[in-house]
Amino acid sequence: MASQRLAPRKSSAAHKSHRKPKRSWNVYVSRSLKAINSHMSMSGRTMKIVNSYVNDVMERIAMEAASIVRAHKKLTLGAREVQTAVRLVLPPELAKHAMAEGTKAVSNSCR
């Protein structure tokens, strides 16, 4: 009887599909809340709502910045386009604070 050679079996770990972890703003929202008031917390449902809201605002800013880049026939999305998009998407007072915080964050990261 001739012996049959079987193909080596792959490990079961190789067959498992890997899901990307869902990115969320939960950590940053809870840190901001603790910085404001250390005794407060958020329920899971509230955190999902805030996370959804932040994702929506970020997506709107990204879409607006991309349309600005296309309108100016450029290939690179820079800080200036993002600033313009923030001014267009957010209400004036909130945009002013966002611009100040964004400028501060960029200057701190460039040190």
Curated annotation (Swiss-Prot):
Region (Disordered): 1-24
Keyword DNA-binding included in the entry's annotation: yes
Principal location: nucleus
DNA-binding found in the keyword field: yes
Single GO cellular component term: nucleus
TM region(s), chain numbering: none
PROSITE patterns noted in UniProt: HISTONE_H2B
Gene3D superfamilies reported in the protein's UniProt record: Histone, subunit A
Biased composition (Basic residues): 12-23
Keywords attached to this entry: Chromosome, DNA-binding, Nucleosome core, Nucleus
GO molecular function, one term: DNA binding
Pfam families: Histone
InterPro entries assigned: Histone-fold, Histone_H2A/H2B/H3, Histone_H2B, HISTONE_H2B_site
Subcellular location, record wording: Nucleus; Chromosome
Cystine residue pairs: none
Subunit relationships: The nucleosome is a histone octamer containing two molecules each of H2A, H2B, H3 and H4 assembled in one H3-H4 heterotetramer and two H2A-H2B heterodimers. The octamer wraps approximately 147 bp of DNA.
Functional note: Core component of nucleosome. Nucleosomes wrap and compact DNA into chromatin, limiting DNA accessibility to the cellular machineries which require DNA as a template. Histones thereby play a central role in transcription regulation, DNA repair, DNA replication and chromosomal stability. DNA accessibility is regulated via a complex set of post-translational modifications of histones, also called histone code, and nucleosome remodeling.
Family classification: Belongs to the histone H2B family.
Name of the protein in its database record: Histone H2B
